[in-house]
Design a protein with these regions (language model features):
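Short beta-strand/loop motif that positions the catalytic acidic residue
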Residues: 180-182, 186
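A domain-start/cap signature at the N-terminus of enzymes
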Residues: 1-48, 63, 74, 103, ...
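Cap/lid segment of the alpha/beta-hydrolase catalytic domain
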Residues: 83-106
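Short, proline-enriched alpha-helix->beta-strand connector loops that line the catalytic pocket
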Residues: 173-178, 238-240
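Alpha/beta-hydrolase fold nucleophile elbow
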Residues: 123-135
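Conserved alpha/beta-hydrolase "acid-adjacent" motif
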Residues: 187-199
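Short substrate-entry loop that stabilizes the transition state in hydrolases
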Residues: 40-90, 164-165, 188-190
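Alpha/beta-hydrolase active-site loop
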Residues: 100-122, 143
Length: 240
C-alpha cells in the first residue's frame, strides 16, 4: 500500500507567520514548520531555505535559536524547519548513513516531498533552494547536495561533516557553493574526523576539487586575541 499521502494539514502557531504542518511519509507521521513573511512579494523571486536541526534536537528549538526571521523578512525568503524522525535506536535525527546507519528513515525523499508541497502553494524560485544545518543537520545538508543536488543551489554546514558513505558515494548534479563553519576543539564532530566522519579538510578539499576552485584560499583573520582565532577562508574562481 501507498505509505505516503499527497496532502498535508497546516495550522497557525502562536508566532506570527509561522505554521506547523503535519503529513505522513513512508508510513511515519512527520511534520515541519514553515515561516512565510507577512509581506511576501509574490511578484519577485522567492527563495527557500531548509533549516535542519541537530541530533536529538527539534525543529521548533532550531527555529528559536537560529533567529532567521529578520533575514527572511528582509530578503523575501521562505524558511522550512523540518522535524527529524525518532526510531527505536535513535533520537530525532537525519538519516545520513554512517553513524545513523541503523536508521531506515527516507529523509532524502521526505525533504523532496516538502519541496513539492511548498512549490504547490507558493511560487518559489526552484533555482534558489538552499539547505543549512547544525551538526547532524549539517551532515544532512551535505547528504542532500550529494543525493538531491538537482534541487539545491547551495548548502551550509555548521559543525557538521560528511559520513564516509556520503563522501564515497557523493554524486552532485552541478557545482555547488558550500559554507562550512567548524571549531578546532569540537569533540562531538571532530575537526580531524573519526571512524564515522571525514575530516573537515577532507570535506573542503572534496568540494574545492569538485567545484574546480583555486586550491589556495583567500584567508581573512576575522577575529584574534590571546585565546581565540577565527579564520575565514574563501576559495575563488569556482565553476559556480
Amino acid at each position: 500500500p501507498d505509505t505516503n499521502t499527497n496532502t498535508e494539514s497546516c495550522e497557525n502557531t502562536s508566532i506570527d507567520n509561522l505554521q506547523k504542518c503535519d503529513l505522513k511519509h513512508d508510513n511515519l507521521d512527520r511534520y515541519y514548520y514553515i515561516y512565510i513573511p507577512e509581506n511576501l512579494d509574490n511578484n519577485s523571486s522567492i527563495p527557500v531555505l531548509f533549516a535542519l536541526h541537530g541530533y536529538g534536537s527539534s525543529a521548533y528549538r532550531h527555529f528559536s535559536y537560529t533567529n532567521y526571521i529578520p533575514i527572511a523578512d528582509s530578503n523575501n525568503l521562505v524558511i522550512i524547519y523540518p522535524q527529524g524522525a525518532t526510531t527505536d535506536t535513535l533520537s530525532s535525527h537525519w538519516n545520513v548513513g554512517g553513524w545513523t546507519s541503523k536508521s531506515t528513515v527516507k529523509d532524502i525523499e521526505f525533504i523532496d516531498t516538502l519541496i513539492n508541497f511548498t512549490k504547490n502553494k507558493i511560487m518559489i524560485d526552484e533555482t534558489r533552494i538552499y539547505s543549512s544545518g547544525m551538526s547532524n543537520g549539517g551532515y544532512m545538508s551535505y547528504h542532500l547536495a550529494c543525493n538531491l543536488g538537482e534541487k539545491f543551489a547551495a548548502i551550509a554546514s555548521i559543525t557538521g561533516s560528511m559520513t564516509n558513505g556520503t563522501y564515497d558515494d557523493c554524486s552532485p548534479s552541478h557545482p555547488t557553493p558550500v559554507l562550512q563553519i567548524h571549531g578546532l576543539l569540537d569533540y562531538v564532530v571532530p575537526y580531524d574526523g573519526n571512524a564515522g566522519s571525514k575530516s573537515i579538510p577532507d570535506v573542503i578539499d572534496y568540494w574545492v576539487n569538485y567545484n574546480s576552485c583555486s586550491s589556495d584560499p583567500d584567508r581573512l583573520i576575522k577575529y584574534s586575541n590571546d585565546f581565540d582565532l577565527i579564520l575565514y577562508d574563501t576559495y575563488i574562481n569556482c565553476l559556480n
